[in-house]
């Protein structure tokens, strides 16, 4: 399991639009349709990565808590499903059901969404304000598989608390660590 850090995109960057298949309802959805009134969290995740499996339950808990404040959550899987069949849309849907996802789980078949977001690893978190300007990018918390630190979503929660109060904490930005996105071979 190779550790890959997230790419630290500049704060203030606008969220690129997309139109991706939501495997939970078998329908294409755009960012404009899914964004939250107060803010939007875009998470690059997948099914097979141990780092993602480690945080899935916490992600759902945080999403349930902050959706009440007008923040929407969107999960995207961009992995090459030919070489990583565990990340297929069918198994994505099963994963969403197993973990009781309360947010859309989108399949980025062309990987273009991961490219324009400069996503580097799974899990990777991007928090946008109501104008879809980036206010946080990075990790959920310091917990990793096997390091015995609590998986509490502390960093993401702090970023969301700042967002709710219309503030940005530039010192809070800490890269995520996870599995690299599994890029298709040309």
Where are these regions (language model features)?
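Chalcogenol-based redox active-site neighborhoods
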Residues: 1-164, 168-173, 180-183
């Amino acid at each position: 399991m190779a550790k890959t850090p997230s790419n630290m995109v500049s704060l203030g960057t606008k969220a690129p639009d997309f139109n991706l298949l939501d495997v939970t309802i078998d329908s294409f959805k755009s960012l404009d349709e899914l964004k939250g009134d107060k803010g939007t969290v875009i998470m690059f995740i997948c099914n097979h990565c141990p780092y993602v499996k480690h945080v899935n339950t916490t992600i759902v808990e945080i999403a349930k808590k902050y959706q009440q404040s007008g923040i929407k959550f969107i999960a995207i899987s961009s992995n090459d499903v030919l070489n990583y069949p565990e990340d297929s849309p069918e198994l994505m849907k099963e994963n969403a059901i197993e973990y009781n996802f309360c947010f859309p789980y989108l399949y980025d078949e062309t990987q273009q969404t991961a490219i324009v977001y400069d996503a580097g690893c799974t899990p990777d978190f991007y928090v946008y304000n109501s104008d879809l300007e980036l206010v946080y990018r990075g990790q959920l918390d310091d917990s990793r598989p096997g390091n015995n630190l609590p998986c509490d979503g502390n960093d993401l929660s702090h970023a969301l608390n700042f967002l709710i109060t219309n503030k940005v904490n530039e010192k809070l930005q800490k890269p995520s660590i996870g599995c690299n996105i599994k890029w298709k071979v040309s």
